[in-house]
Amino acid sequence: GADASVTVGVSDSVRLTRELSVAASSPVSTDRIRDLLRSRDVRFGDYNEGELAYLTPNAAFFWNATNPQILQLRAQWRGIARTPEQFGELAREVAACNSTRTGPKAYVAPLEDGTQYGLIAECNVVVMSGLTQAQLDNFFETSMSMIMGFFADLEVTLPGFVDWDSQGREVSL
């Protein structure tokens, strides 16, 4: 840490202090995620109790900074399993994702009606000690690209689930 550094002259000391403060970890909060998304021109809205939602044509992304220990990016893919066969297809893709990819973690989740299922993918990072801006930027880029890549692959593997176009408009199958 800073204790071990050797100080040479006042200007070096001042510069070192400034560099350390720029690279310092700070707590992750919903406001900090808001600033991050705004800085990247991401159009988002408030979702329930401190979550921020971002909609893409094929998914809904949810940023959750309410847990002081973990920052989570969770996304629900727009494809829905409406039959037992489709449930099986989703479950196979989830198992393949979780056994062959470093991220995201995927799972099948029942929808409100209890008869249909959606697919959720999430990436988490431990934030107990806070994150530097570089770490936060890196988590944003890595988690978004891992989840978006997984969903793009799903749409190739399971074209029967895709009932929307590239603008997110519903299309009949």
Predicted regions and their residues:
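Short, internal acidic amphipathic alpha-helical interface segments
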Residues: W77-E122
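A short acidic-to-branched-hydrophobic micro-motif
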Residues: F61-R82
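A short acidic/glycine-rich loop-to-helix N-cap element
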Residues: V127-F140
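Glycine-rich, aromatic-bearing surface loops/beta-hairpins
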Residues: T142, M146-F150, W164-R169
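Short amphipathic alpha-helical signal-transduction/dimerization elements
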Residues: N98, M144-L158
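Charge-rich, low-complexity N-terminal segments
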Residues: G1-N67
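A generic structural signal for beta-strand entry/edge sites
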Residues: E49-E51, P68-Q72, G114-G118
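Short, highly charged C-terminal tails/helix-capping segments
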Residues: E155-L173
